[in-house]
């Protein structure tokens, strides 16, 4: 035994070959946390003194090779100064460099995901052999940072500038064959053959059959490209990256490129200093704080879903009531994840529409080479369309997805309850109607919950699981388990008008309506909010949702929260609806829609909209700068999010933030409404509320904000 730790062990195998194995005790995955970094430095000390080691393989005892750095430690680490972060990273890099410089060949045996620091660990080895089931990559830019353990330095020298820039800037992991084509690994083998293949490579290095020293030397010197070739590689990468992401919103890819441009002509040690300085700069951006926080919130939401699922009943078969686009989308989602599902409607043409929707979505996967025609047929066979309830006797859960009308829903739910087994869960896919109210029609209200999918079902990851007054924990657990089984991210919320997402969204639309009444141009508001980071502004969003849906939702919200969601004027959204402008669904809303060459609706300006809006605009039009537009819309949005926490509609800031990002597209780089308030500062946010309080209750600071500001608290504890 060369080294024995609770994160890493080094044992001798045969012929002077050592096995350095990552094996974090009591952990599901290996990661570079403080203790692992400490032990890795100790391993290097031991190996520098181990005269009997002629070669070494790097392995993992887990299903994952190394998942990367311990993201939970970033929160505290990134609170340090830029200089302190740089020194921290350089100190870790010292062990990586010394490991690379050991006087014998090293081969990484990549059995599972080698991401971030895990990929960087493999790059300090001379050779890399990979299981054909593994993945490898440098996803750090998705956290608002970039590789800091030598990843930008070694990748450019191993796979070339252009390939390294694409790998780092996109953050997308590579499958084994793609990694082999890039030169990121030297061989791929079946998982069972991995260790033998790694040992064989080491033996070839020891015997001189492979020139491992030359492989190492390439990583220690500048990149071997002339200035023109370098300029072409960087210009191409910048064009690709900046077309995909605004560097003002997501600066990490641009900062990574800048660091690489500085260090490509430097030897390793100097290059790593440049990388460390760039990493520290990225780590101090608000985007890094938000995206690291978002990663941790995502982990918490998934952990909570697992906890909620503990009391779940087994789900062997589901059913959906109501076909069409929504029912077809739900059926597709279940079937594509291996769950048999019955799709019932009272009209055969609706069943055809639902099956057509599922078939269309699966057909696209076949066209993209992600599914075989045989697999498509197998998936479609899991969906059983029917006009009657004959097959419902053994169904474990029924999702009601009929028209958004409380009387229709109550009648359908009451009918199906009498035809299913006593422990069958009933779930309503409603976006606004009270679950407690719908439950009044049922004999077994404890078996009834809300299950709000977002449209389009196959794209939107969020599912709100709504607890009514009488919903049992088993019913909630089973519905959460179903959502997870369908590949969705469930967030459990308590019942109220609009639940969580729509309750927060409608004050945002209300703030938008008020801006238009006072003279703002809807197209300009859209541009401002898109620049802020939304995928679409409020006018375009309501066109996509449908103005009829928007007006119906606004009526429900006005009845539920009249003090702040019932305007005393007719707004632009209601006016356009009355003039039969429904948005994309009938080609005219705030914008006019024309089909592009791909058959997708493209928005264009429409003078008729401006003529109509003149009738609702105040005679004395006001002008608004961009910041005022942002402040007014985001105050209404964020205040209602906080009120949902106050009212215990949602349990944690993490769940609230994740729901708003997944459900309505809140800018991820801003971390969600709660983190947005944190970054603004509670005192500053409170002052902004007071500045606009004269506009109405929606702009007044919730008591929770006042209490937190007085106590010096934040939504996310600072380390």
Curated annotation (Swiss-Prot):
This is Fatty acid oxidation complex subunit alpha. NCBIfam families: FadB, PRK11730.1. The record marks 120, 140 as: Important for catalytic activity. The active site is at residue 452. Residues 1-190 are annotated as: Enoyl-CoA hydratase/isomerase. Keywords: Fatty acid metabolism, Isomerase, Lipid degradation, Lipid metabolism, Lyase, Multifunctional enzyme, NAD, Oxidoreductase. In the N-terminal section; belongs to the enoyl-CoA hydratase/isomerase family. Residues 313-719 are annotated as: 3-hydroxyacyl-CoA dehydrogenase. PROSITE patterns: 3HCDH (PS00067). The gene is fadB.
């Amino acid at each position: 035994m060369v080294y024995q730790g609770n994160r890493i062990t080094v044992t001798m195998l045969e012929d002077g070959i050592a096995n350095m194995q990552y094996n974090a005790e009591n952990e599901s995955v290996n990661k570079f946390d403080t203790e692992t970094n400490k032990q890795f430095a100790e391993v290097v000390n031991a190996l520098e003194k181990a005269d009997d080691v002629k070669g070494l393989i790097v392995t993992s005892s887990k299903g994952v090779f190394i998942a990367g750095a311990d993201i939970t430690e970033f929160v505290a680490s990134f609170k340090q100064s830029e200089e302190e972060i740089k020194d921290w990273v350089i100190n870790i890099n010292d062990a990586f460099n010394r490991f690379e410089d050991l006087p014998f060949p090293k081969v990484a045996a990549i059995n599972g995901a080698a991401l971030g620091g895990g990929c960087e660990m493999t790059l300090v080895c001379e050779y890399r052999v990979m299981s054909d089931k593994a993945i490898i990559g440098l996803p750090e830019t998705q956290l608002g940072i970039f590789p800091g353990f030598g990843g930008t330095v070694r990748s450019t020298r191993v796979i070339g500038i252009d390939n390294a820039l694409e790998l780092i800037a996109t953050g997308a992991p590579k499958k084994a064959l793609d990694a082999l084509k890039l030169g990121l690994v030297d061989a791929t083998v079946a998982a069972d053959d991995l260790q033998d293949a790694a040992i064989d490579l080491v033996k070839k290095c020891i015997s001189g059959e492979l020139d491992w020293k030359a492989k190492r030397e390439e990583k220690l010197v500048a990149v071997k490209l002339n200035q023109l070739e370098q300029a072409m590689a960087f210009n191409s990468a910048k064009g690709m990256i900046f077309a995909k992401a605004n560097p003002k919103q997501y600066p990490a890819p641009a900062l990574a490129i800048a660091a690489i441009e500085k260090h490509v002509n430097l030897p390793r040690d100097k290059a790593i200093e440049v990388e460390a300085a760039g990493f520290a700069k990225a780590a101090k951006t608000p985007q890094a704080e938000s995206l690291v926080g978002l990663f941790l919130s995502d982990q918490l939401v998934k952990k909570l879903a697992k906890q909620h699922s503990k009391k779940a009943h087994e789900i062997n078969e589901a059913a959906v009531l109501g076909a069409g686009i929504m029912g077809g989308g739900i059926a597709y989602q279940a079937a594509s994840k291996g769950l048999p599902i019955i799709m019932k409607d009272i009209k055969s043409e609706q069943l055809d529409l639902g099956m057509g929707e599922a078939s269309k979505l699966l057909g696209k996967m076949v066209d993209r080479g992600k599914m075989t025609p045989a697999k498509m047929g197998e998936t479609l066979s899991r969906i059983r369309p029917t006009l009657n309830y004959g097959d419902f006797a053994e169904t474990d859960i029924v999702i009601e997805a009929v028209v958004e009308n409380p009387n229709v829903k109550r009648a359908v739910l009451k009918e199906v309850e009498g035809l299913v087994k006593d422990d069958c869960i009933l779930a309503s896919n409603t976006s606004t109607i009270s679950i407690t109210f719908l439950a009044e029609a049922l004999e077994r209200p404890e078996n009834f919950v809300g299950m709000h999918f977002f449209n389009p079902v196959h794209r939107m990851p969020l599912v709100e699981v709504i607890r009514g007054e009488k919903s049992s924990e088993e019913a909630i657990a089973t519905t959460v388990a179903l959502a997870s089984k369908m590949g969705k991210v469930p967030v459990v919320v308590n019942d109220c008008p609009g639940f969580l997402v729509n309750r927060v969204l409608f004050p945002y639309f209300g703030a938008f309506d008020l801006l238009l009444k006072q003279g703002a141009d809807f197209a300009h508001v859209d541009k401002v909010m898109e620049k802020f980071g939304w995928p679409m502004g409020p006018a375009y969003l309501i066109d996509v949702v449908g103005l009829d849906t928007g007006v119906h939702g606004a009526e429900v919200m006005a009845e539920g929260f009249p003090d702040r969601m019932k305007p005393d004027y007719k707004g632009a959204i209601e006016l356009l609806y009355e003039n039969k402008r429904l948005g994309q669904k009938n080609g005219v809303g705030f914008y006019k829609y024309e089909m592009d060459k791909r058959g997708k609706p493209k928005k264009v300006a429409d003078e008729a909209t401006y003529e109509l809006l003149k009738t609702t605009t105040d005679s004395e039009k006001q002008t608004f700068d961009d910041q005022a537009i942002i402040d007014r819309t985001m105050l209404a949005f964020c205040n209602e999010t906080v009120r949902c926490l106050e009212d215990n509609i949602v349990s944690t800031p993490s769940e609230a933030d994740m729901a708003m990002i997944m459900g309505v597209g809140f800018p991820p780089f801003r971390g969600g409404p709660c983190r947005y308030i944190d970054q603004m500062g509670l005192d500053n946010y409170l002052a902004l509320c007071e500045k606009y309080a004269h506009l109405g209750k929606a702009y007044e600071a919730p008591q929770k904000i006042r209490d937190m500001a007085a106590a010096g608290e934040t939504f996310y504890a600072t380390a």
